[in-house]
Amino acid sequence: VHLTAEEKSLVTGLWGKVNVEEAGGEALGRLLVVYPWTQRFFDSFGDLSSASAVMGNPKVKAHGKKVLQSMGDGLANLDNLKGTFAKLSELHCDKLHVDPENFRLLGNVLVVVLARHFGKEFTPPVQAAFQKVVAGVATALAHKYK
């Protein structure tokens, strides 16, 4: 991902304030609610029968936190996203058979969640920089599919 120095600063500055547990659970939960076909990858998570069940599900929250912790690893290695996400790409491609489009969807949901959490602090330049990052992460995660 090519980010200017200013964009990197905007992304890392905001990311330092993100509550990964809260935002991660919300982002994954929203993905599962808005795109219900993604639930098939989470059969072991128990009750996903309604929006409130999904959003209150402790396994959704825990996995969402894990997802955002990985995102943090990516932000620390913006110049090597493919390397950073190589093992996760392999897992999601070879073992879990996740449609790579889901990575893009989750990235877009994450941008919405961050906008909701940060309000006016999530300025258009911050959003634009985050869109670049989540697109780069989605591409890195889809790398093994090519």
Curated annotation (Swiss-Prot):
Red blood cells. One of its GO terms (biological process) is hydrogen peroxide catabolic process. Signal peptide: none annotated. PROSITE patterns: GLOBIN. SUPFAM superfamilies: Globin-like (SSF46458). One of its GO terms (cellular component) is hemoglobin complex. Pfam families: Globin. Keywords: Acetylation, Heme, Iron, Metal-binding, Oxygen transport, Phosphoprotein, S-nitrosylation, Transport. GO terms for molecular function: haptoglobin binding; heme binding; hemoglobin alpha binding; metal ion binding; organic acid binding; oxygen binding; oxygen carrier activity; peroxidase activity. The modification S-nitrosocysteine is found at residue 93. The modification N6-acetyllysine is found at residues 59, 82, 144. The keyword Transferase does not apply. The modification Phosphoserine is found at residue 44. It comes from the Eukaryota. The modification N-acetylvaline is found at residue 1. Residues 2-146 form the Globin domain. The keyword Protein biosynthesis does not apply. InterPro entries: Globin (IPR000971), Globin-like_sf (IPR009050), Globin/Proto (IPR012292), Hemoglobin_b (IPR002337), Hemoglobin_oxygen_transport (IPR050056). The modification Phosphothreonine is found at residue 12. Heme b binds at residues 63, 92. Involved in oxygen transport from the lung to the various peripheral tissues. Belongs to the globin family. Heterotetramer of two alpha chains and two beta chains. This is Hemoglobin subunit beta. It comes from Blarina brevicauda.
